[in-house]
Amino acid sequence: VRTKVRLGLKNFDACTILLNNDRSAGSPGILEDLHEQYLLPPLHAGWSVRRKSTHFKNYEEVAKRFGKMLGIDPWLINPMFSQVGGLNFAEDTGVDALQAATDALLTKVRRKYKEYGINEKPFVVIKPDNGTYGMGIMTVRDAKELDALNRKTKNKMAVIKDGQTVSDVIIQEGVLTQERVNDAVAEPVVYMMDRYVVGGFYRMHAERGVDENLNSPGASFVPLAFEHSTHMPQPGVRPGVSAPNRFYMYGVVARLAMLAASYELEATDPDAEVYD
């Protein structure tokens, strides 16, 4: 039931409306102008408006400040990225700029690998700056690979969920997936409410490699053992001897990402109040 300023049911008037849709195709009009109710998350957090590059710029700043506090290189918790706009994969428009940006990022990653003695071959992941759902994703190890994209790849990159056309992409430093669950490559996904880590799961895919996108058909999921982690520091032993508690580390990065998201949404809020 929609009134002038509220949305509810026949016998229920909520103070808060919880949204569980990413709104890639846009927000329905029935949710607009609800100034007396909270929308969680707000409308400008939908993926028709939100951009990955904006989030990662905010996360980069948070990681730098956190790294300075601890005296660590922020790169250890913040993979490098860049953004390219003005693309049209169907017509090969902007591919030269994408190739140049990809080559530049791979060069930066190689320098970091040399600094830390990492012998793996670097790669980047190119994905739409808008949208979600693991669509329109491409792994590149050499910028020359972008010279001759086949029609299938162009079509995959040109349009994503809900028919959205891709004109802007984010190029992210690829990070090899080291985790395994039942011999399948696995990556952690952490759930948060407010500033609290409340759980998570491993997304795993037996048919994908350590440098591939796991968010694809055939993926399966198992809960993360946050509460009953067996990898806790042992009492009385020297620091660094106990096996690392990976689950705690996941939670730290998740909380940093949540802080970055709060900065992001505050900066992009169309109804933000301005104080003189």
Predicted feature residues:
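Short, flexible beta-strand-to-coil junctions
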Residues: 21-23, 128-131
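Amphipathic, soluble alpha/beta structural segments
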Residues: 61, 65-75, 89-96, 182-184, ...
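Conserved N-proximal alpha/beta basic substrate-recognition cap immediately N-terminal to
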Residues: 1-120
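C-terminal active-site "lid" helix and adjoining low-complexity regulatory extension at the edge
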Residues: 196, 205-276
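Short, surface-exposed, polar/charged, turn-prone segments marking secondary-structure boundaries
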Residues: 23-26, 44-48, 66-71, 151-155, ...
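A glycine-rich phosphate-binding loop feature that marks nucleotide/adenosyl-phosphate handling sites
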Residues: 79-81, 122, 127-129, 272-275
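Phosphate-binding site of ATP-dependent enzymes
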Residues: 16-17, 101-123, 130-135, 140-224
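Low-complexity, flexible helical/coil segments
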Residues: 50-60, 74-81, 159-165, 203-210, ...
